[in-house]
Amino acid sequence: MSQPRPLLSPPETEEQLLAQAQQLSGYTLGELAALAGLVTPENLKRDKGWIGVLLEIWLGASAGSKPEQDFAGLGVELKTIPVDSLGRPLETTFVCVAPLTGNSGVTWETSHVRHKLKRVLWIPVEGERSIPLAQRRVGSPLLWSPNEEEDRQLREDWEELMDMIVLGQVERITARHGEYLQIRPKAANAKALTEAIGARGERILTLPRGFYLKKNFTSALLARHFLIQ
């Protein structure tokens, strides 16, 4: 079997993207890094996004940190998801930054969250810390769109959370709000403040927030598609 090679340009079809992702299944991160001419860090403490960057290189992703999807031409977002030995997610999944101002007229249908989750290529990766980073294997990919029930679940949480933001209650939002979708601070340091609406409608400064999918949502999603018991 010939070794896979990174895509040098963005994939032109979903089929090409999925076929390339399937070729990576079973390889370790160390093997994929070496084949791409990259050095594998000892751990992810200083390189938190390294796995995502590695897989973006292999799959020809184009967006980087821009607001559009990773595969903008296909409308597909790439999400790597660390899993345990039973294939269950080990952490929540970042979706996008939560807008804290300028939200008048925004609906679920036009929201950034829905745009990012419209079509997702999920790639599970072994994530248990007992496995050295270079030895963690890449799992089988899944190309997913939310079904009617999943869309409803996400919409209800999004509407509840956005109502709180618009009504000046952003500081009262905790990770427990939302059944499947949560908002929590997203900042490398506590000095990175952004504008938001306060309880009396005034402008306040607060930590940037991000939308995250809770583990119960991604766990059910993976279990249903991979028949994990």
Curated annotation (Swiss-Prot):
Single GO term (MF): endonuclease activity
A single GO CC term, please?
cytoplasm
Spell out the subcellular localization from the entry: Cytoplasm
Q: Which GO terms describe its biological process?
A: DNA modification; mismatch repair
| SMART domains per UniProt | MutH
Q: Which InterPro entries match?
A: DNA_mismatch_repair_MutH, DNA_rep_MutH/RE_typeII_Sau3AI, DNA_rep_MutH/T2_RE_sf, Restrct_endonuc-II-like
Entry function: Sequence-specific endonuclease that cleaves unmethylated GATC sequences. It is involved in DNA mismatch repair.
What is the protein name given in its UniProt record? DNA mismatch repair protein MutH
Q: What is the lineage of its organism?
A: Bacteria, Pseudomonadati, Pseudomonadota, Gammaproteobacteria, Enterobacterales
Gene name for this UniProt entry? mutH
